[in-house]
């Protein structure tokens, strides 16, 4: 193994940049959304082409260097690695093209959600993304992809038509292959839902959708004492089509409040009537964060998340799926959150997000699990995605913040009779105690994934977010 990989890598790359410790660009090259679980690699390879991805992967494998892939750099610990490992950084491969006639979007591996929205909206189209502009579009899709169009078209992975992925064979040689329903269909199944396990995706083709609507958006503010009332109301609504929302525990000025955010991706005339039971709740109408009926142009749909999605500080984000939301569980989780803020006021930027979407379309898609490797529980058993986000600066709080996330999960899952409801793991945002089976399930699906791993990554060089 070479002591410094820079010269060796530059010799085998065509137009890519290699950055190592001591270079002026080094601090920016290893910067991520969160400093939590950050590691120091031997080098960061900022690739610019499929050929250079192949060369970088081949170099890493042949020199016994672990490697990880960085798209948007928003995972807790996936896109970072210690020396002698290297980071293959796709951030200079962000081209997005739209074919209006074919209604498709083609995105390079480093394209962000914001890149996808910008390109699609420029020609009157939309593409399935999450809620953060700077998160990697393809990286999020590989794990299923919760997001804005879920109620209309299903998970982001449901909208993928094909992918190009760099894989490594038994001899350690890297190559790019196509994956689609017609070519390497087994790999295509695995990529759509468990795609971090198999290779480096350098390009994906998504369905695009004609889109002319602004999005209706409202935010109601409540005191903590009303959390149970709000949870009961949220649980009673059947979300359809473009309806989506988010229940938020947050503490602006270190004073905890509950937010109920609502979006409707569709006709504004329909929005208020569909959300009427929630709009009738007694919110704090004089609060500066309380408003009803704003319109957001599609290109700006995710702009309100820019602060929470921006780089800097230490953030520990995890997620799990939940079937039902009870008033008691919501109040218990809020109490855990408020106790934490009292004990650690320096971490008052911490949020707890509970997102909900219309699931009617997602439940109708891929009912037998033969088209995607998205867990069937995502479609049948999840109505809510709970996402505790511990946000702080002091590394001394790492353990306390990791503990908070787990305590929030347990509060939501503990039922009134003391039994524990089943939570559904999310591979894109795992808890630190998540396991192979809590994320990928058991039985036939897990066995199929393991067989695919042996076929497409026989040397086990692609680390994945959660190990098989």
Curated annotation (Swiss-Prot):
Disruption phenotype: Accumulates astechrome instead of hexadehydro-astechrome.
Sorted UniProt keywords: FAD, Flavoprotein, Oxidoreductase, Virulence
Residues covered by the FAD-binding PCMH-type domain: 37-211
Induction and repression of expression: The expression of the hexadehydro-astechrome cluster is induced by glucose.
This protein's pathway: Secondary metabolite biosynthesis
GO molecular function: FAD binding; oxidoreductase activity
Function statement: FAD-linked oxidoreductase; part of the gene cluster that mediates the biosynthesis of hexadehydro-astechrome (HAS), a tryptophan-derived iron(III)-complex that acts as a virulence factor in infected mice. Within the pathway, hasG converts the prenyl to a methylbutadienyl side chain. The HAS biosynthesis begins with the synthesis of a tethered Trp-Ala dipeptide by the NRPS hasD.
Name this protein carries in UniProt: FAD-linked oxidoreductase hasG
């Amino acid at each position: 193994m070479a002591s410094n990989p820079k010269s060796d890598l530059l010799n085998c790359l065509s137009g890519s940049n290699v950055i190592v410790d001591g270079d002026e660009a080094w601090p920016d090259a290893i910067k991520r959304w969160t400093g939590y679980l950050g590691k120091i690699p031997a080098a960061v390879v900022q690739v610019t082409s499929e050929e250079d991805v192949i060369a970088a992967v081949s170099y890493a494998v042949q020199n016994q260097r672990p490697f990880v892939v960085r798209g948007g750099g928003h995972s807790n610990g996936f896109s970072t690695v210690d020396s002698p490992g290297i980071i293959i950084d796709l951030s200079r491969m962000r081209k997005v093209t739209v074919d209006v006639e074919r209604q498709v979007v083609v995105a390079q591996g480093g394209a962000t959600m914001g890149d996808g929205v910008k390109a699609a909206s420029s020609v009157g189209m939309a593409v399935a993304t999450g809620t953060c502009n700077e998160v990697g579009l393809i990286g999020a899709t590989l794990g299923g992809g919760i997001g804005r169009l879920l109620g209309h078209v299903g998970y982001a992975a449901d909208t993928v038509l094909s992918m190009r992925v760099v894989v490594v064979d038994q001899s350690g040689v890297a190559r790019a292959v196509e994956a689609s329903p017609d070519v390497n269909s087994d790999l295509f199944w695995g990529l759509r839902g468990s795609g971090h396990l198999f290779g480096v995706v350098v390009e994906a083709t998504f369905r695009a959708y004609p889109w002319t609507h602004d999005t209706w958006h409202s935010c109601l503010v409540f005191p903590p004492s009303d959390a149970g009332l709000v949870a009961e109301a949220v649980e009673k609504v059947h979300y359809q089509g473009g309806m989506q929302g988010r229940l938020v525990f947050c503490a602006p000025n270190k004073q905890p409040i509950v937010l109920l955010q609502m979006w409707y991706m569709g006709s504004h005339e329909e929005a208020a009537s569909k959300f009427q039971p929630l709009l009738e709740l007694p919110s704090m109408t004089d609060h500066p964060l309380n408003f009803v009926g704003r319109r957001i142009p599609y290109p700006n749909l995710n702009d309100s998340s820019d602060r929470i999605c921006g780089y800097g500080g230490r953030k520990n984000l995890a997620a799990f799926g939940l079937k039902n939301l009870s008033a008691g569980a919501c109040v218990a989780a809020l109490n855990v959150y408020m106790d934490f803020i009292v004990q650690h006021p320096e971490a008052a930027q911490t949020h707890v997000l509970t997102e909900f979407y219309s699931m009617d379309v997602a439940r109708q898609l891929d009912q037998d699990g033969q088209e995607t490797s998205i867990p069937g529980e995502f479609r049948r058993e999840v109505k809510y995605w709970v996402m505790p986000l511990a946000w702080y600066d002091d590394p001394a709080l790492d353990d306390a913040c990791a503990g908070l996330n787990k305590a929030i999960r347990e509060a939501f899952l503990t039922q009134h009779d003391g039994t524990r409801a089943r939570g559904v793991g999310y591979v894109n945002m795992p808890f630190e105690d998540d396991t192979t089976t809590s994320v990928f399930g058991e039985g036939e699906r897990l066995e199929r994934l393991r067989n695919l791993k042996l076929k497409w990554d026989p040397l086990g060089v692609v680390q994945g977010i959660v190990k098989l």
